[in-house]
Swiss-Prot record:
GO terms for biological process: angiogenesis; animal organ morphogenesis; apoptotic process; asymmetric protein localization involved in cell fate determination; canonical Wnt signaling pathway; cartilage condensation; cartilage development; cell proliferation in forebrain. GO terms for cellular component: cell surface; endoplasmic reticulum lumen; extracellular matrix; extracellular region; glutamatergic synapse; presynapse; Schaffer collateral - CA1 synapse. Residues 238-266 are annotated as: Disordered linker. This is Protein Wnt-7a. Ligand for members of the frizzled family of seven transmembrane receptors that functions in the canonical Wnt/beta-catenin signaling pathway. Plays an important role in embryonic development, including dorsal versus ventral patterning during limb development, skeleton development and urogenital tract development. Required for central nervous system (CNS) angiogenesis and blood-brain barrier regulation. Required for normal, sexually dimorphic development of the Mullerian ducts, and for normal fertility in both sexes. The lineage of its organism: Eukaryota, Metazoa, Chordata, Craniata, Vertebrata. It comes from Mus musculus (Mouse). The intrinsically disordered linker region is required for recognition by RECK in brain endothelial cells. The gene is Wnt7a.
Amino acid sequence: MTRKARRCLGHLFLSLGIVYLRIGGFSSVVALGASIICNKIPGLAPRQRAICQSRPDAIIVIGEGSQMGLDECQFQFRNGRWNCSALGERTVFGKELKVGSREAAFTYAIIAAGVAHAITAACTQGNLSDCGCDKEKQGQYHRDEGWKWGGCSADIRYGIGFAKVFVDAREIKQNARTLMNLHNNEAGRKILEENMKLECKCHGVSGSCTTKTCWTTLPQFRELGYVLKDKYNEAVHVEPVRASRNKRPTFLKIKKPLSYRKPMDTDLVYIEKSPNYCEEDPVTGSVGTQGRACNKTAPQASGCDLMCCGRGYNTHQYARVWQCNCKFHWCCYVKCNTCSERTEMYTCK
């Protein structure tokens, strides 16, 4: 582990008041005043604080899963006006967009998937109490397919169930945005479940495959990022439906006249159109594109014309000098030339 990574983990544990101990390949977590510490973590709902106090080891994993989701979000949108950033108060799930847009839909889905992925992985690795390998995928023989369960299958049902209880608990209000958030949370988890992998190993004499054992594994999170980015591009505009006047919304339907069709379980849904993300706006949570690096010649979203929203861009020139064309001379010294290069960088005004 790099020094920077160790420092980041240290800050995380200290901020939560948690001592992380690794004993014999397993991890145990000792909370130092969990009640006090959990009450200081910003943005937690009462149910989430209760889970934090009872399962501080799981809170560390939840934080790692949330960060994994945010990192993937930033990767997928690194070349767009919106780069997975937002204004507002920081929570355990990062800063949140205030409008119910496509971007908010993606954020909720990728974080929900990240938390479920991290919990499931921690169970498989033996780093969490009360969970482990999937007990239902052990020893059963699938005669038609010629293999049986073996190894340690990832218990995705436990991971999704635990993540659902924690992540969904922040949705306290009963309004259209809550319905949207809960739908996108579920979509992220369901897409994770649908992309689980089956790995197998052959057993037999001289490389034959007389018997085969198989187990389920988690997909690479980057794969989920690409799947969810496609879902973002095809996100469905929805609106709330109320059972009667003056009642809270009960479900979401696709926003089309004379239609009550509900979105698919794995659709990302949004209730408001996206802002253009050109300017900083506390109302929407947009941080704007001022100061963002752009590509002068690119025609797509990362190009300066689109990224800078017509405001123009600044040009920064840099000189890089290094030793090059080095040769060894007998005996015994090395002679190098000095090479230099001028580069330009462009940032939005």
